[in-house]
Amino acid sequence: MDYKDTLLLPTTDFAMRGNLPECEPARYAKWDEQKVYEKMKAKREKSAISFNIHDGPPYANGHLHIGHALNKILKDIILKTHYFFGQGIRYTPGWDCHGLPIEQQVEVKLGDKKKSMSKSDIRQECRNWAKEFITVQKDEFKSLGVIGDWNDPYLTMKFKFEANIYRTLCEVAKKGLLVERSKPVFWSWAARSALAEAEVEYEDKEDYSLYVAFCLSDAACKKLGVSDAKAVIWTTTPWTLVANQAISLNPNEKYALTSEGYIIALPLKETLINQGIINGKILKEFASSELEGLSAINPLNGRDSRFILGEHVLMDGGTGLVHTAPGHGEDDYFASLKYGIEVIMPVDEAGLYDETLRVKKLLPEHLLNEFIGLHIFKANEKLIELLGDAAVKVSKFVHSYPFCWRTHKPVIYRATKQWFIAMDEPKLSGKTLRQTALEALKSVKFYPEVGVKRISSMIENRPDWCISRQRDWGVPIAFFRDSATKEPIFDSRVLEHVAKVFDEKGSDAWWNLEISELLPKGTNLDPSKLEKVTDILDVWFDSGSTWNAVLNSGDYDAGGYQADMYLEGSDQHRGWFQSSLLLSCAINQKAPYKSVLTHGFTVDGNGNKMSKSKGNVIAPSDVAKRYGVEILRLWVGLSDYSSDLKISDDILKQVAEQYRKIRNTIRFLLANINDLDDISSHFGTLDKWILARATKSFKEVSECFKNYEYSKGFNILLNFLSTDLSGIYLDICKDRLYCDEKDGLRRRSSQSAMAIIAKSLLSLIAPTLTYTVDEAIEFAPDIIKNGAKDAFDLVYEPLVFEFKIDDELLTSSREKFNEIIDVLKKDKIIKSTLEVILETSSNEILANDLDEIIDWYMVSFVRNIESDEFLAEFAVGNDKFKIVKADRYKCPRCWKYAAKIDNDLCPRCAKVLKRV
């Protein structure tokens, strides 16, 4: 007789294979249609705690890369963690719409056509470009399973948003922190604009290492008591030598005259000997102050180069005499400022030498036509040749050099008139912005903790923030200035009127309207005596003021200010985290965030940066099509985001395997509780054991998730699922689930334990595997749903089963038993553990319910030691065990060797069938 039909086999419509690439888009479309985000807000409306992440806006340019996916998925997991743990959430996604990346793409698209277009038309093209990619990226983000207020995202190019960015600027100006001055700043000659520190990336670049001798003036020689001497400077930028105005010396170091007639810093003597520049013989030592105010002669143009003192002169390389061109370096600028030295700037916005060479006589007359209009980087070789014998030593070396983050061309320092936010003006209740920001960071929690040191160090050492740009696409620095005095006008009525115009017409109005149309009625200002500032704001000012325009304005349902969390890549310590901090501290003297979480960058399986040229780029859309978004989400959950995250096809296959284990565990649980109507309050020993293990594991996992330690939490969870749950308990329970009476006490007890674990498991993994949990709820029996219509009706409730079970002997004896069984199977002595009886001397084990112990070892019987013949024996401490061949017959229904007669049912199975 075939007894298969008498077994209570598992059944569920929750598929073994998820077919994720096909099913996920339809499931998200359903969420969208059902307005799940609104439902989530409503479900937690009465929650005492609400949590918001303020979205760091990506550029509305291009398709998403894997870094975007990592960032948005991690945000989504964290928000949903708070949600499924019973808290309210707010998440308004946003986009950075202005700036160079978009403007460059539009320039490429327009080509020569741009030259004949008005600024307004160019800006409209940029607006259209941004709008197109917002639509593209929004769909791509939503496909990642990310829930948020996608119907009302914030866009920095919205009229009202532009107005609020401008209002933030006005508030900074009113605080007295906004200054306009000529100062060297990072300049992208390729983009023809100033750059902020955050817009500069460092790459290796080959440059000249050049030692140049400047002959001392007669007065300087006389002061040293010599007839001839040369000050030797070192530079890596020969093209700046034409703009040299001074030579800086360290005020605290000794200097020396060598036998070669060279002046050097004494501490660098050995270094220069090793360089082959001097032989080491010193003729005279003197203090740097002896040369202060005297001069040397620039060998390129015969101009005086004054000796000045500066703390910026270090003894870690060069000669200790620093070539000082105040227009081409911040240290040079400040050192020269103290001495009233003129800033000369012979380089135009495109990086070409201009007519300043002629006006200031920076090169001999006969060379001017050759150099004016020449790109500075093409001038190095020509200038070195012109130096002749004054070039003491010339070589090349590779060093880290600043590059424009968008054009990927090397940048220069160039003095131009720009707008700055002052870091060291004591305008904030007697404190500087630098001091206020550093103080505010002390109340911010960082994940990982090292983040606070990193951003604090950057704040401590950063220069004033250059916020002006000479481009088209951005929010204008919309100030009027007096045409005669050039002084900016910060009249509150005027500023607020301009802001209101922007509210209605957008910031394009600054260019489209006449000055008279931009002034409020009743003003005493004469439009004919005013002019407009034409610079635009640094795009980091846009994103840095989003806390004000989104959280503080009341225009969005995005949660409160301060935000509970800012979450971006670790590069944002110098970018968005910092710009947001500075603007919030400038206006409100506090950080815009309560916590900051940073993640590393995505790299390939070998730890290499991804690039198209290497062919190692992995697009999130490709992962979604091949594996499903859920695999990408689990990859984020399994990865330690505090460092760089590796991703490759092999890694994704491993993640897919882990996902398969999770899915199959869920499927097994659902399939085996399909006929359970009520949770039993009676639990057997093994049920108590698994519930106690689940309580402990889930508590550890939930604590990890609450602390955003997802990798650690998932490792604990996966270990529990594979070892305790699937590896032991579910395997053990198959016999009672399939073969016991439908309403048998042991079967219902195990089903109840499984249902309890399944409910907790689903709500615990829902933040990460939302698609899967939603699918599971769709096909789950009512005992699991408990009224839930979808995953978003779930709330995680901690398990509280504190059964005191001393399982040390049980687990250690089971491990040893299984080791021996593996050998017996390998030697083909047995095929199954059901073929044996376990005998033991352990009173502790024998004191348990016999059926529970039989199932624990998955044998046909357990008894006291009585057999002389045995297949194997082992001991655990003082307890002895024997593995004995079963002495009864195999039951054709349950396969246990418990039948008294061959081909007969065992007593248990006979009893079950009798009652059917």
Curated annotation (Swiss-Prot):
Positions annotated to bind Zn(2+): C891, C894, C906, C909
Motif range ('KMSKS' region): 609-613
An example Gene Ontology CC term for this record: cytosol
Binding note for cofactor: Binds 1 zinc ion per subunit.
Catalytic class of the enzyme: ligase
Matches recorded under CDD domains: Anticodon_Ia_Ile_BEm, IleRS_core
Amino acids binding L-isoleucyl-5'-AMP: E568
Listed EC numbers: 6.1.1.5
Domain of life: Bacteria
Binding locations of ATP: K612
Motif window: 'HIGH' region: 58-68
Reactions catalysed: tRNA(Ile) + L-isoleucine + ATP = L-isoleucyl-tRNA(Ile) + AMP + diphosphate
Cofactors: Zn(2+)
Keyword Lyase assigned: no
Keywords: Aminoacyl-tRNA synthetase, ATP-binding, Cytoplasm, Ligase, Metal-binding, Nucleotide-binding, Protein biosynthesis, Zinc
One Pfam family hit: Anticodon_1
Known role: Catalyzes the attachment of isoleucine to tRNA(Ile). As IleRS can inadvertently accommodate and process structurally similar amino acids such as valine, to avoid such errors it has two additional distinct tRNA(Ile)-dependent editing activities. One activity is designated as 'pretransfer' editing and involves the hydrolysis of activated Val-AMP. The other activity is designated 'posttransfer' editing and involves deacylation of mischarged Val-tRNA(Ile).
Family from the record: Belongs to the class-I aminoacyl-tRNA synthetase family. IleS type 1 subfamily.
Record's comment describing the protein's domains: IleRS has two distinct active sites: one for aminoacylation and one for editing. The misactivated valine is translocated from the active site to the editing site, which sterically excludes the correctly activated isoleucine. The single editing site contains two valyl binding pockets, one specific for each substrate (Val-AMP or Val-tRNA(Ile)).
Stated name of the protein: Isoleucine--tRNA ligase
GN (gene name): ileS
